[in-house]
Amino acid sequence: ASEDGGRGPYVQADLAYAYEHITHDYPEPTAPNKNKISTVSDYFRNIRTRSVHPRVSVGYDFGGWRIAADYARYRKWNNNKYSVNIENVRIRKENGIRIDRKTENQENGTFHAVSSLGLSAIYDFQINDKFKPYIGARVAYGHVRHSIDSTKKTIEVTTVPSNAPNGAVTTYNTDPKTQNDYQSNSIRRVGLGVIAGVGFDITPKLTLDAGYRYHNWGRLENTRFKTHEASLGVRYRF
């Protein structure tokens, strides 16, 4: 330990591995609310993804307690899903005409935690001159953008058999119906989280830090966003 008891301002740089859980509360297709998307599949309602991102912090060490402000940007998640379902409506036995309903769904979604600006209060446990486990609490102002584009196309396919020997069948696409839904939001909210980890003093001023943090970004309109992060970084005290 240094002569000043470890007190002073510091900067820290981390590389974090984040598990991101995004839950969208879209209404069911039969819901009466027509102002929100109702055709998206469960694939876009409940998203789990992982990313790696940098994080920087500045803080002050009071010799036991620390306060720190941090900033991070996350990777943009985007994906698409296409599905098709063919359902037989009826077959006319008297003439062999078959009618099927073909439903195509095309969904495109994006989610981006644009930024997180946090303030943490952290307590270091003095185990020995080198190791310092710590716990803390964090409040953060987060900015999130997300969008979904859902297209549902339904057509009836009529198949007419040929009366001629070895003749080809004839198909007709009738009664096409298309439903397009789009939603885009840019939201800013204050969320809460917890921090834990351990610091190892390489020198009196340089510390290797391994940490974990959980953060609930708050209620983002129809979206809930939570992150679990494991990080490794270095902290330099002036």
From Swiss-Prot:
SUPFAM superfamilies: OMPA-like. One of its GO terms (cellular component) is cell outer membrane. One of its GO terms (molecular function) is porin activity. It is found in: Cell outer membrane. It holds the Pfam family Opacity. Changing residue 234 to M: In strain: MS11 / V18. Coiled coil: none annotated. It comes from the Bacteria. Keywords: Cell outer membrane, Membrane, Signal, Transmembrane, Transmembrane beta strand. Residues 1 form the signal peptide. Belongs to the opacity porin family. NCBIfam families: autotrans_barl. Implicated in a number of adherence functions. OPA proteins are implicated in pathogenesis and are subject to phase variation. This is Opacity protein opA60. It comes from Neisseria gonorrhoeae.
